[in-house]
């Protein structure tokens, strides 16, 4: 069983408890289905108990966390809460003196600002669209749109996120998560990496059985009447974005699994199975390692499992990799994407829940 101190590092004393589960009474706001499941179902009780333990340490700068968490912004707030836990796991000091960007973190003399963003559900996902079209067209366009909205944003003084007094001349990261479909995180990382670097990669094996990786340049992404250029990081105008951070597992199920392994299923009423795909360290491997296991109090999943940082090769203020040791890091060199990760690091996962 992991102690709470190992789940998130506590740099300050508990503040005023934010009761996110006391349902708001607002006739103009509909309570989200996701919140209802978390708040009322036995299956998600470990997640609910874990979040209740975390919230006294979380500072609601905007003052609207509870309302958004329960209504239209559930996924976005789960993503922010996940990031909070991850940055604590990496032993960053989180400075909440500023309302924007979403996070201002410090470690080893480095200061970094982060703005969070999500891809939300759209009507197009109710249509019968082929998975290849989603990966190769729709999702890159949607990632591009979400990232562009953060780049174009200015405050009342016409300043961008990286131009504030406390953020200028420091690295700036956009942390983006795909909530556009229940399982889209499993495959959307390919869409993101293709959009950012403008290359896809084909694989083949030579006669000796050695793996060959062939880069293939992508000019743009098209879907219906929308066209978006590929290679976001290759444009000098985007040099202020030091990196893009994303995770294939920054969801409610992450809180469920860590809640389970932390002892919040006291009587072991839930059977939680995790189907996962892991990085294969074999240099000739072209497919991930597949595994199915039960989540127990002996499990040791980290917040950083499944998290990737995509580094901008043209960043004005690059990110130092050693500050994020639990993340998988992606770099672009000579038309190839170089990935630095731990052996058997998590690529993606699916969670199955049943009551014993």
Question: What are the residue ranges of the model-derived segments?
Answer:
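Metal-dependent nuclease catalytic core centered on acidic motifs
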Residues: 120-291, 295-304
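Short, charged/polar micro-motifs that form catalytic or ligand-binding hotspots
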Residues: 69-77, 164-169
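Charge-dense, extended regions
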Residues: 263-356
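TRNA-binding/sensing appendages of the translation machinery
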Residues: 76-84
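A short acidic/basic microdomain associated with nuclease active sites
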Residues: 84-106
């Amino acid at each position: 069983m992991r102690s709470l101190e190992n789940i998130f590092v506590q740099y300050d004393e508990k503040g005023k408890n934010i009761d996110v589960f006391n349902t708001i009474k607002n006739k103009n706001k509909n309570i989200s289905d996701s919140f209802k499941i978390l708040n009322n179902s036995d299956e998600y009780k470990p997640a609910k108990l874990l979040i209740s333990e975390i919230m006294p340490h979380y500072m609601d700068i905007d003052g609207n966390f509870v309302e958004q968490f329960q209504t239209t912004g559930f996924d976005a707030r789960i993503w922010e809460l996940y990031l909070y836990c991850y940055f604590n796991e990496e032993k960053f000091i989180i400075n909440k003196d500023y309302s924007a960007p979403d996070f201002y973190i410090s470690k080893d003399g480095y200061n970094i600002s982060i703005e969070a963003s999500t891809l939300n559900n759209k009507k197009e996902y109710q249509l019968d669209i082929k998975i290849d079209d989603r990966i190769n067209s729709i999702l890159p366009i949607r990632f591009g749109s979400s990232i562009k909205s953060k780049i174009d944003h200015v405050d009342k003084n016409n300043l961008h996120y990286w131009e504030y007094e406390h953020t200028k001349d420091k690295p700036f990261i956009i942390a983006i998560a795909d909530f556009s479909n229940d399982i889209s995180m499993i495959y959307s990382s390919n869409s993101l990496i293709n959009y950012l670097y403008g290359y896809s990669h084909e694989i083949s094996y030579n006669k000796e059985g050695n793996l060959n990786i062939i880069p293939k340049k992508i000019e743009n992404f098209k879907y219906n009447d929308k066209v978006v250029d590929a290679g976001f990081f290759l444009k000098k105008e985007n040099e202020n974005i030091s990196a893009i951070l994303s995770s294939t597992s920054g969801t409610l199920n992450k809180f469920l699994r860590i809640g389970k392994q932390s002892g919040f299923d006291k009587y072991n009423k839930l059977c939680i199975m995790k189907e996962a795909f892991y990085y294969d360290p074999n240099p000739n491997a072209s497919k991930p390692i597949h595994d199915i296991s039960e989540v127990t109090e002996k499990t040791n999943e980290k917040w950083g499992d499944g998290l990737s940082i995509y580094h901008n090769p043209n960043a004005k203020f690059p990110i130092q990799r050693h500050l994020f040791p639990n993340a998988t890091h992606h770099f672009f060199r000579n038309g190839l994407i170089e990935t630095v990760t731990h052996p058997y690091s998590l690529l993606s996962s699916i969670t199955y829940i049943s009551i014993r």
